[in-house]
From Swiss-Prot:
InterPro entries for the chain: PX_dom_sf, SAM/pointed_sf, ZCCH14_SAM, ZCCHC14, Znf_CCHC, Znf_CCHC_sf
Species in which this protein is naturally found: Mus musculus (Mouse)
Sequence ranges of Gly residues compositional bias: 29-43
Keyword terms of this UniProt record: Metal-binding, Zinc, Zinc-finger
Molecular functions per Gene Ontology: nucleic acid binding; phosphatidylinositol binding; zinc ion binding
Pfam families found in the cross-reference section: zf-CCHC
Segments forming CCHC-type zinc fingers: 913-930
Name of the protein described by the UniProt record: Zinc finger CCHC domain-containing protein 14
CDD domains per UniProt: SAM_ZCCH14 (cd09558)
Superkingdom of the source species: Eukaryota
Length: 956
């Protein structure tokens, strides 16, 4: 019967069949050897040896426990659940001796299907009025007759109405019979005491037909071992065949046996009918029965819901009871053969299930392949990068002073899915934040898909693949490019930067996000673990992993993407010159990003990121800038000696304490060039949880440098590429101006309409040679101070370096993005002329005070007006209140026509003020008496747009 029980999987049924057959045969053959030998060789006799038996007594002999080794274990494994059998400690009443007692309670303990699956056997545990307990097994037909008779004897119970179908069990489907039978059984379990005391009930449960007697089949088998009485959680026997536990047994003396001990229980059996509740029944068909205890531990509810949902999708949820006992894993691994075992399934259902399960298996296989092989990413072009200057395995060289040049061949995918985050999306009007909202909404699914692509590659000594993975997420995942060095250089060797051959450029110009992975291979000096970081940076790259080995090694990861803001790294610990930091400028334009290295901040083309500055002073260096598809321009920078963890990530809530503690002792400064922030995403998205918390703990001097860029220029050669930041150093910094320098060469073609189509032809060779400098500096030598370039003068009108006569402002980012924004702060009204969404695509520079937690941006106009907190103060907009961020004469967020004067104290006259809450003019939203609107409802924005003041330029 167990072989047909729907509660068991195919494998469980097979194991059960084998085990039970062995037990049955061993019981029949080796019965005379006492309790310990009852297992027939499978269980060794315990310390007590053969247990005493007394064939004449009707009471149980005192318990002497003998551990049974393998029978119970195998059965327990077959059932995949542990349970606790407590019933053996209860007084067992010999069958047939119930003349003076009545039934107190009936518990249903299990249903067993016979081979034809038509009849069901029910096992009951009966508590008698003298506190004895017996176990009775009856067939469903007997139970049906009993309940129908009981309904005649006790007409007031309305049993016939309760179970109208029990009279003709064969005229209904098995499922229907089970339902009806269960209704009757439930009634028996909850029957009132006067019904249970009825003579008919007493006779029914005190008599037993020979095939269902619970006594031992022959007097020559006096002691029957209890198999599988394992103490567990549920208080139920797992594998006692007719094992019926009792809930009243907690007071009994047998509860002290340990969780994994199996007890072999001697039973005094008598031919007259004394028997143990745990004795195996002799089946007419000789197939052993297993009774499922009612509290058999079922799989987790969520797994159950998973199966149910899965079946619902196929419109097969009515068959859910068939698979109820399976886990999701087992359910999905069912084969056609297994499905054929379920006789209650129709042919159509089996066929449908078979097809869907095969599809599911293919999907999971594909997923496994994806997670094990980094090159198998759905809809991705794969590029193989071969190191050209190495013949053997690529290993970190001890004394080699050259960097191997990498050749990249990109095989673009057959079809590129239209994806958000492509350059065409960013070339739209910079004043439309609608795209930001869409990107933000899809970023959750993006993180899901990214997590799937999170691949951990362990570099081994034998392998030397260098892979470039062009990742094209269809759901606006934050695609990234990661470059890891193929070689380590010791501190004495100068670092050379070789550009990638231009084959990469055609790919890069329209492949947009690229994921590059150059696996670093371990050598005896220790290598680096290569991680293909999922760009949902929720899995922190732990630098301890990268620094387990003894020798200096360098793993540099550049996670490049669109909308990447740039951070200068912290240099290594104080004994070393702090100027050895890498300043990586990962630009938004895929055509020509630039990277600057070293204290002198030489500009290097982004194609050379395969060779980054690696010195002994910087054992691990990682730059990662995740894509703006989540709405945040960001750069993640790890620079640390082995004990240090530093992570600055836009999509990760960074640990401020860790970052703060590690940044200050390292004498490092972090500067962020404002011109590279994506203006549409810097302020308004929920994912702008830019956790630059380390920056807030590092004193940063004014950022000097010149930015000049026009939004219609696509060629990087037209921009000054040598503007760097000369940072004021910390007091403990040995060489002030040698702190990490920043290359600020924004490629504004990222924002131009032609950014998506800007071709590598725009990068002249002269521009490339102009970008690349080889920097040779011996570590012992004191760092040479970089000459401070002209101040960071940015024209607030056109973005030029100040030649048009407008005033500019120097910038100091002291507390840059200290706290993440709260809530989904997407502004969905593109008709407001908010300057950070305009202004040639650049967020103008600004000075941030010590307490400012958010960046505020200057208006593109130089009018003497002050910020009206258009975005602040109301809970309707989850944007930080901008009034708190005034620092000196720094302009705060200024919107045209809605602002006052720069001293930050007075507002414009109220005639031009407009309340975005009620739509009226003359007061601000902070003073509005109307209840604030629900920002999530579409179409409720009631703004009466006030025309811009005459003093401002009317072209914007």
């Amino acid at each position: 019967m167990a072989s047909n029980h729907p509660a068991f999987s195919f494998h469980q049924k097979q194991v059960l069949r084998q085990e039970l057959t062995q037990i049955q045969s061993s019981l029949n053959s080796g019965g005379g050897g006492g309790g310990g030998g009852g297992g027939g060789g499978k269980s060794a006799p315990g310390p007590s040896g053969a247990l005493p038996t007394c064939s004449a007594c009707h009471k149980m002999a005192p318990r002497t426990e003998t551990p049974v080794s393998s029978i119970s274990n195998s059965l327990e494994n077959a059932l995949h659940t542990s349970a606790h059998s407590t019933e053996e400690s209860l007084p067992k009443r010999p069958l047939g001796k119930h003349g003076k007692v009545s039934v107190e309670k009936i518990d249903l303990k299990g249903l067993s299907h016979t081979k034809n699956d038509r009849s069901v056997e029910c096992s009951f545990e009966v508590l008698w009025s003298d506190s004895s307990i017996t176990s009775v097994t009856k067939s469903s037909s007997e139970v049906t007759e009993f309940i129908s008779k009981l309904s005649q004897l006790c007409p007031e119970e309305n049993l016939d109405k309760l179970i109208p179908c029990l009279a003709g069990p064969d005229s209904f489907y098995v499922e229907r019979n089970h339902v009806d039978l269960e209704a009757g059984l439930r009634f028996l379990a909850s029957a009132p005491s006067h019904t249970l005391k009825h003579d008919h009930v007493r006779k029914f449960f005190s008599s037993s037909s020979p095939s269902q007697q619970l006594q031992s089949p022959s007097p020559g088998n006096p002691s029957l071992p209890k198999v599988g009485a394992v103490m567990g959680v549920s208080g139920r026997p797992v594998c006692g065949v007719a094992g019926i536990p009792s809930s009243q047994s907690s007071a009994q003396h047998h509860l002290q046996h340990s969780a994994s001990t199996s007890a072999s229980l001697p039973h005094c059996s008598h031919t007259g009918g004394t028997g143990s509740a745990l004795a195996y029944r002799t089946q007419v068909d000789n197939s052993p029965t297993i009774l499922m205890p009612s509290s058999l531990q079922t799989p987790q509810p969520q797994e159950q819901n998973g199966i149910l949902d899965w079946l619902r999708k196929l419109r097969l949820h009515k068959y859910y009871p068939v698979f109820k006992q399976l886990t999701m894993e087992k359910f999905l691994s069912l084969t056609e053969e297994d499905l054929n075992k379920f006789e209650s399934l129709t042919m159509g259902a089996k066929k449908k299930l078979k097809t869907q399960l095969e599809l599911e298996k293919e999907k999971s296989e594909r997923r496994c392949l994806n997670s094990s092989a980094p090159s198998l990413v759905t809809s991705s072009g794969v590029a193989r990068v071969t190191p050209t200057s190495h013949v053997g395995p690529v290993q970190p060289g001890r004394s080699s002073s050259h960097a191997s040049e990498l050749r990249v061949e990109v095989e673009p995918p057959a079809h590129q899915l239209p994806r958000e985050g492509s350059s065409s999306e960013y070339s739209s009007s910079s004043s439309s934040p609608m795209g930001v909202q869409v990107r933000e909404e899809s970023s959750d699914s993006a993180e899901e898909s990214d997590r799937r692509v999170d691949i951990h590659v362990e570099g081994t000594e034998k392998e030397k693949p260098v892979m470039l993975l062009a990742h094209f997420p269809s759901s606006s995942a934050r695609p990234t490019a990661q470059v890891l060095p193929v070689q380590n250089e010791t501190g004495s060797s100068p670092a050379a930067h070789h550009p990638l051959p231009p084959q990469l450029m055609p790919a890069a110009s329209h492949l947009a996000p690229v994921r590059m992975l150059n696996s670093v291979h371990k050598s005896d000096r220790g290598g680096a673990d290569v991680k293909l970081l999922s760009s949902s940076v929720h899995s922190l790259l732990s630098l301890e992993e990268r620094n387990k080995g003894p020798g200096p090694r360098s793993g540099t990861k550049v996670d490049k993407s669109f909308g990447g803001a740039v951070l200068d790294p912290l240099p290594s610990a104080a004994p070393h010159p702090p100027g050895q930091g890498l300043s990586g400028l990962v630009e938004n334009n895929a055509v020509s990003p630039t990277v600057s290295f070293g204290p002198r901040a030489k500009v290097v083309h982004a194609a050379t990121l395969d060779r980054v500055l690696k010195t002994a002073q910087q054992p691990a260096l990682t730059v990662e800038s995740s894509s703006a598809t989540t709405g945040t321009p960001s750069t993640v920078l790890h620079v640390a000696r082995p004990p240090i963890k530093l992570l600055l990530a836009s999509s990760v809530p960074a640990d401020a304490a860790i970052a703060g503690q590690t940044s200050c002792p390292n004498n490092g400064q972090i500067s962020v060039p404002p011109a590279i922030m994506n203006p549409r995403t810097a302020l308004y998205t929920a994912n702008t949880k830019v956790a630059f918390s380390a920056v807030s703990s590092v004193p940063v001097g004014p950022l000097q440098g010149s930015f000049c860029a026009n939004s219609n220029t696509a060629s990087p050669s037209s921009h000054p590429s040598t503007s760097f930041a000369s940072m004021a150093s910390l007091p403990s910094c040995p060489a002030p101006s040698s702190s990490p320098a920043l290359s600020s060469v924004p490629e504004s073609s990222f924002y131009s309409g032609g950014a998506g189509s800007s071709s590598p032809g725009n990068i002249p060779a002269s521009s490339q040679s102009h970008h690349h400098h080889h920097h040779h500096q011996q570590p012992p030598a004191p760092p040479q101070p970089a000459p401070p370039p002209p101040g960071c003068i940015v024209c607030t009108s056109c973005g030029c370096s100040g030649s048009c006569g407008s005033n500019g402002l120097t910038v100091s980012y002291a507390n840059y993005f200290q706290h993440p924004f709260s809530g989904p702060s997407v502004l969905t009204f593109p008709f407001l002329p908010f300057s950070p969404m305009c202004g040639n695509g650049y967020v103008s520079t600004q000075q941030y005070g010590g307490g400012s937690a958010f960046p505020v941006v200057h208006t593109p106009y130089n009018g003497s007006v002050t910020p009206d907190p258009v975005l602040g103060g109301q809970s309707t907009f989850a944007v930080p209140p901008m009034q708190n961020f005034m620092a000196g004469t720094a302009g705060v967020y200024q919107a045209q026509g809605l602002v006052g004067s720069t001293n930050g104290s007075s507002h414009k006259k109220s005639g031009n003020l407009s309340c975005y809450n009620c739509g009226a003019t003359g007061h601000r939203a902070q003073d509005c008496k109307q209840p604030s609107m629900d920002f999530n409802r579409q179409g409720t924005f009631r703004l009466k747009y006030a025309p811009p003041a005459e003093s401002l330029d009317s072209t914007d």
